[in-house]
Amino acid sequence: MVEGVPSAHRHQPEVEPVPFIDLVAQHATIETEIQEAVQRVFASQAFLLGDEVAEFECDLAEYCDSRDAIGVASGTDALILSLRAADVGPGDEVITSPFTFFATGGAIHQVGAKPVFVDIEPHSFNLDTEQVETAMTERTRAVMPVHLFGQCAEMEPLWRIAVRNGLSIIEDACQAIGGEYRG
């Protein structure tokens, strides 16, 4: 009993929780394959840059119809490395979406830049490209659209904006690996 709160106000309807994601069920479908891969890595002792990583990178590049793929520890690391490769750093601004995993803004912050959040399109939940130019300042160095739910952001207008203003585009595709723009 909660002191001072009448019991009528403490009633909670019986609600069955909705699981965020069932990793146990997902894991069960590929458990044998994972165990075999882990055993191969332990047997080879090649924990970094070994044959398994090289094979994964080739497979991922082929899956994404890309010339190259580079395996890193996480999507966050991929974004940080991409920002650094684009020479984004302290004092710079990167326009991105607020509707994303916290790592998107966190990666921008990690390199010393400031995330500038632009609203999303209500039908796709992706970056509203019409708001990008109005959010730009002289410190804007890049635009980081986030491809969500396997659906790519509207890239054509972003490419035009980037070319016209000398900006880098760094695509956060962590939630849309294999997604195709107008494909």
Question: What are the language-model segments listed below?
Answer:
Residues 42-93, 106-111, 116-119:
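Phosphate-binding glycine-rich loop
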Residues 84-173, 180:
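PLP-dependent aminotransferase-like
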Residues 35, 39, 57-61, 80, ...:
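Solvent-exposed, non-membrane alpha-helical residues enriched in polar/charged side chains
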Residues 20-22, 73, 144-146:
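Short beta-strand segments
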Residues 1-46, 51:
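N-terminal "arm"/small-domain region of PLP-dependent enzymes with the aminotransferase-like
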Residues 60, 173-174:
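Active-site His/Glu-centered metal-binding helix of metallohydrolases
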